[in-house]
Each structure stands twice: as C-alpha cells, then as structure tokens.
UniProtKB/Swiss-Prot annotation:
Name the record gives this protein: Cytochrome P450 monooxygenase ascH
EC numbers on record: 1.14.14.-
UniProt xrefs under InterPro entries: Cyt_P450, Cyt_P450_CS, Cyt_P450_E_CYP52_fungi, Cyt_P450_E_grp-I, Cyt_P450_sf
Species lineage: Eukaryota, Fungi, Dikarya, Ascomycota, Pezizomycotina
Uses: Ascofuranone is a specific inhibitor of trypanosome alternative oxidase (TAO), and quickly kills African trypanosomes in vitro and cures infected mice. As an essential factor for trypanosome survival, TAO is a promising drug target due to the absence of alternative oxidases in the mammalian host.
CC annotations in GO: membrane
Amino acid sequence: MGLSLGYSPDRGSIGSWICAAPLILALFVISYRLFQSVIDYRLSHRNGCKPPPTYPHKDWYLGLHHVFGLLKAKKENRLPTAFSELFDASGPDVHTLGHYVLGKKSYWTRDPENIKAVLSSKFNDWGLPSARKATFRTCLGGGIFGVDGKEWEHSRAMLKPSFTRTQIGDTATLSKHADNLIARIPEGETVDLAELFPLLTMDVGTEMLFGESVGSLDPAEIKQATRFTTSFDYIVQTMSKHMALPILTKLRDKTLQGCVEFVDDFAADVVNRTIANESKTEKPSSLGKYIFPTELAKMGLPEKQIRIEVINIMVAGRDTTAALLSLIWWYLAKRPDAVMKLHQELEPLGGRPPTGEEVKKMKYLRNFVNEILRLHPINPLNSRTAAKDTTLPRGGGPDGKSPVFIRKGTQLMFSSAALQRRKDLYGEDALDLRPERWERIRPSAFEYIPFGGGPRICPGQQLALTEASYFTARLLQEFQGVTSESSGPFQEAFAILVTSGDGVKVKFHKKH
C-alpha cells in the first residue's frame, strides 16, 4: 500500500477546471472592465469631457468578433474599407469611438480636429506604440520610423537635407531611369507594373541619396535585384504581422533573419562604396548633392547606425513611390477618358521630356494623383499611444462636440482612408475616383493626410509626388494607350502600405 503525500486530482477535476477556464476568463474580463469603467467615468467627466460612442460589439467587451472581421477583410483585400465600416456601424455621424479587445479599451477616430491634436497641436502628448518600436528594432534594427523623442529629432535632422528642392527637382536623373523603365516594357504584351515599379524607385532612390544607382532595372543585375526585392517584401510583410500581433517579435524566424542579414549586407556594401567613392574624388554626379551615408559618416555616426538609417530610407523611398505609381496605373488602365485628358495636357511639349516645373503645372495630372491618394492613401491606418493623460478636442457626448479624456497608455487608431472617404467632406460620390472634384474642393490640412501631418509628416512626400507624376508623364508620352488585364474592382491589399492585390497587369500600345 502506497502512502499519499498530497492531493492528486483525478481526470474529472481536471476536466472541470478546463470547462471552467472560459468562465473564469470572462469573469476576469468583466471585472476588469467594470473597474476600468468606474475609473474612466470619474476621469472623463473632468474639464467637461464626455465619453464617445462605443462600437457595438457582438461579444460585449471581448471584441473578438470585430477582430476576426478585420482579419477576414484583410484576407479579402478590403481592409481599408472595413475601417470606414467600423465608424458607420457605430451610428450616424460617428467619427470618434471607443473600442474593446479582451476588455482593453482603445479609441478610433476619423475626425480631422482630433487627428490634428494627435499629430500637431498636442504632438508631445503622444508617442509611437511599443509594438511599432519593437517591430522596427526586430526587422530593421531601429531607425527614424521606429523611434520618437530626441532620437527621432536627431534622425529627422540628418535626413531632411536629402529632400531639398535641388534634390527633388533633378529631372535629369529621373529621365535616365524613365528610359530604363520604358526599355523593360514590351509593346502589346502583358506586363506587371507592380513588379517593375519597385525596381525603378530603388534605382532612383539610391542615386538620389547615395549618388549612385544600384541598377535594379539593368538585366545584368536582375538576379541580385530579385533577391533584394524578395527579401525586402518578406521583411515588410513580417513587420505588418508583428505590429498586429506584437508577441511575434519574441519568436525566432529563420527566414526573417536571413532576409535581414541579406538586406543589411546590401546596405553595408552601398554605404561603404559610397563613402569610399566620395572620399577619393568629388564626382560630377554628386556635385551639389547631399550624399546621405557620407554626411552621416562626417557626423561621426557608427557604421551600424548609418546602415540602419539607410535601410529605413530605402524602405520608405522604394515602397511609397512604387505603391503610388501602381495605384495610378491600375486606374489609368481602366480609365481611357483620363488617359486622353493627360495626353492633351502633355501635347504642348511635343514629345520632349517635361521639366520638374512643367510637371507641377499639369493641373489634371495633379488632380488625378491627389484623387488617387484621397481614395487610396498609401498608409490608410496609423496609431499613437498617449504618453500622458490627455484629451481629444471633440467626439464625446450625444452630439459629439465634447472633449474626450484619454488616459496615459491608451492607444488611438486614426484612419486616413476612413477620413478621406467621408461623404460630408468629399460629397456623396466620395467612394468614386473623380479627379474633377479637385477643381472645386480645398480640404484643410488635416482633412487630407495621405502623407500624415505635423512634425512627423513624411519628409519625402514632395519627392514621391514628383517621381510619380514625372514617370506617369513619360510613360504617357511613350505610349498611345494602355489596357487593363485585370477584371473586377481594385483589391486593397494592405500590409504596411496599400498595394494592388492582383498586381498591375496591363498592355501598352505604342504611338504610330
């Protein structure tokens, strides 16, 4: 006979605990929510603050039904549209709301005044979410887009000279790369521009920032360029997953590690070659230009930090402009009326490549690009975390006019896609692509935020607009027409940026 030294649960008791676990979790969430509600109620009624409407969760405060809904929308390539539906489901004229996931409260807004407070007037009350910081550390080593405070100010100051008027207006450089792009487009054959544009923007970006292009569009470099693009794309997709599920940053990913090492080696080669070339002689191609790695080296930055900043800028410079070009041409291939108007606008040039100033004066082209960015902002969702107890200027109370109290540590999501599709701001046809609307509307600074706003506004926005407009003009000068090989509506694939879920498959037709 054995001697029992302690309690040994039988299978029945273990089963009871397993069955009780969901109930215990639910009770914990409810208790936490009730406690939080009492605290929030007391704090939110200070200084005239009132709570905003709450999203009508089907599973009360767990919020899992809506989370699964967003995941479904992402799989269906309609996630930016789902952001607007979040507000519409919460009531008429709701532009700021409370939202729960596992009992934890966050806020969403598409109100320009609230977005202005977060990005500008109360800039110091808000910081980057910890998930974003961790993601950039894991995937890119850190850098300007994953830091805030003094560290961000320092990175921003180093980067700003790269986007002077002289750098942006260098159409001689753009013309050369436009020729390389055109040489890769066969007449009358299907080509996926979504594959070519990242190569183009990588070539332009590296020459603008480093004084020398990596030559991605050169057939001799295609193998290296393809590997770089594949590695880059995997990193960006992983970053999207990490920001959605921060726990993933703790898990080992051998594929990610290999991609990061390859991109880091690539950046190291670019940095070392650029610094070595600049130290030997001042090449004519670099005269008057701010060569990014060289200037960082002059400031005494360690080589590793230079590589990190270079990779950050390569991500932004390649992907943002490539995504914008893809959006423009997905729609142009469906809109022969727009192509005709753009050809008419280009006709006075007589086939001569436009200058930067001439591109800026092309009114319909500018309106078309503005409308693309309104309907499909490249980054349709952003977020901040309250660095201190603060308030949003409005959105609270039954009429939505009272300020809203935000407790320190609370996350706020703001969607440029939901904002820029508001019918009260852009008309009943706000969901349609209509460039002509820009002949009569003049949205305020925070009613139209395709590149963000405030101190953290995208430093490369003018470069992206110039490149996208210039390359669009050059392709239109080279080809008489373009037809789409895609059927159905635009597929809003969203990772870090919005891209076309089915690529940009088109056929170009030469002028005869």
